């Protein structure tokens, strides 16, 4: 038997005859909804009307007593919220909710975690926190339905990732990620730049690269073009300074992307939580630490497909591949000459800069005069009065060099150097881009070899040459080398008497059988004069000055070789008289 619509709201006699029913009938005996008249004892689909009015998605359970349309349910009225907060005036239906709410004002946290002691204002928050210690799952996972799993990508555990790389064993959530990753092993770059032809393994990397051609504006889709003729290759367009709007305020380096700037600024701002366990060096990113560890392990995972050579960095392999393909993406805007490396292009562009005239022709040449002897053994240079001829009155601290009115004034820096090779050698005229290269080159003329081998005493003009020489002594050392601290930080101040270990030299060196030991590196010498000359390599003392240019030397023979360069450049008949014969001055008190 089917129930009529009216039977849906039938109630017991107690409910029908109750006082609340009579009160509602007195309040609203009849309701008019459209063309239909509804009464409380005969409401049809009343809950549907109520749900549609409230905008709810599902039907709510019916009240035992039919309500008038528009009357709020019990607990939904403003008069039912008797618990009011005295701080902010917010009302609550239950007193327990008010107590929890007031803890947000007082800061009270009575629920403590038994593991770490952290406090919480609500017991449910403490329960959620304790799951971080126990590893308990908050929700039970239903058994999966038959068929392939349909879990969100971000919630797939690492152990359930179906795609694994056969080269390195790395796992991925999707097969497309595996395909992108395998290109790092194969070197495949299917995404080509339509402007310069550079390839990329990922389309997003190509998009970022294309911004370097037109700043932040992405180029329009490029139709596949024909290959340019090999006779006249077009020079690719390189990014300019105005195409890199993001500038680092610490070092001035420019970037095309803001994310690249933020990544770069980590090296300045810190912190650097990734530390190397081998050498203690710290890095801001974990990827930088991984690259650095290959220096210690010797791992070279990036192999060249042409010759099989390995590289520790992918960028180094990219540069190496250009030697096989002949690709030169870095072009000079002046002469259209292209280079495979950007650093080579920067050095080449210096050749287009006009050098400025900078020489010592504006300064007078001082006649050759002997330099005063250095302080005797056992005295400090700071206590010995300087000779007036060696006062630092002239520019650059050189003796006797007074600028002419047209030259640079006192206290002003010298004119800036410009050009490809601004640092010229006064001996042979050879130019160098860096002053450090000029200093190394000068040792060819002077014969200076300040880098000595602690094993055999052999001298070298370059520190790298000494490092190579030290490898020949590996395995054939007769005595342990001195500790590094003695080589880097001398025990004695410059000019003081070296401390000779008493265990090696008993008493004062009075006979030929005694050895004179260097207090800096422990090297032994049969004569005290050799020890004095050797000490100058540590203290930097250069008592022999050139009268032409004011350059100092630690050995008189080195100064003689240097002065021959000045005489060779000066023809006979020029000057006050014939050139004087060069004699070696032996400082008094040293030998």
UniProtKB/Swiss-Prot annotation:
The modification Phosphoserine is found at residue 12. It comes from Mus musculus. One of its GO terms (cellular component) is nucleus. InterPro entries: Znf_C2H2_sf, Znf_C2H2_type. Pfam families: zf-C2H2. May be involved in transcriptional regulation. The gene is Znf48. One of its GO terms (molecular function) is identical protein binding. Residues 1-24, 55-80, 131-160, 206-241, 372-429, 464-512, 564-591 are annotated as: Disordered. It is found in: Nucleus. The modification N-acetylmethionine is found at residue 1. Residues 224-235, 379-404 have a biased composition (Low complexity). PROSITE patterns: ZINC_FINGER_C2H2_1 (PS00028), ZINC_FINGER_C2H2_2 (PS50157). Belongs to the krueppel C2H2-type zinc-finger protein family. Its main location: nucleus. Keywords: Acetylation, DNA-binding, Isopeptide bond, Metal-binding, Nucleus, Phosphoprotein, Repeat, Transcription, Transcription regulation, Ubl conjugation, Zinc, Zinc-finger. There is a cross-link at residues 58, 150, 240, 300, 449, 583 (Glycyl lysine isopeptide (Lys-Gly) (interchain with G-Cter in SUMO2)). A zinc finger (C2H2-type) spans 83-105, 111-133, 163-185, 191-213, 246-268, 274-296, 302-324, 330-352, 423-445, 451-473, 516-538, 544-566. Residues 8-24, 55-65, 581-591 have a biased composition (Basic and acidic residues). Residues 480-496 have a biased composition (Pro residues). This is Zinc finger protein 48.
